[in-house]
């Protein structure tokens, strides 16, 4: 069993399976299925100590409300987190049902299953804060490892190393989709999945099947009232993440280097109507230089001082956001600029 759990694969070690014409192949990013499945089987609450008897509450927010209503001093209480997990077999059953639901909804004839492994290249990028370091303190669902092992054993899932799972499933979806009369669909909830711009692809995300067939892509506003955010697809979405918005969940934020305030809504207004790739890329680098200067200095998470040109800084954040599109993909931001004949100075 430990051999199954410990075995990991680089992108170039995965067999390029050739499917019969007419096949519909689902490429699963199981990290986005397993984690929420395991998490939902944990019922969390708090136990409050400090008065005559211990009492349970759903969460700290609920208890703070009780304190306010009773004029209690919240800070004098001792609070303990508690977790009650459902039996692990329920996790297995929910996971199996979820997979079957995808297969039925999309009429799949074949499936490939992948999990994230170790040695993610982004972990060593010289960012001000280490990539995804905030997740080290996050409590993992009780049955997470058990469900991962179940997927590896029962579904012959493969664990990917050297990159993130969402990189590899993007590669596989695009590669399989190139096969004659074969439709490959990426199954994920990851927001990065819609940034593909190199070839045609399909992504099934939160009940919606996206057909990606535009290099430039688009941007739009999601949400209502004050709770709105910019979303999109293609290059517009990728560059929005890489050079402007970043990702607070993954701990990379280009705005930490901005010399002036500039937000995603301003960016959206500036680029939403641009209709060709070279013009969009030229505007992007001009705006980035305006925001960070021609060079920048900062201390990375290891304590080392970084003195970088705007392009070197852009390359770091490009590496954070860019999802690989082919095996042994070494595409840089500069490669993209040269490909589209965009002029720039360093």
Locations of the language-model features?
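Extended two-metal-dependent nuclease catalytic cores across DNA- and RNA-processing enzymes
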Residues: 2-15, 78, 108, 133-345
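Noncatalytic, basic helical substrate-engagement surface that gates or grips nucleic-acid strands
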Residues: 3-12, 16-182, 198-211
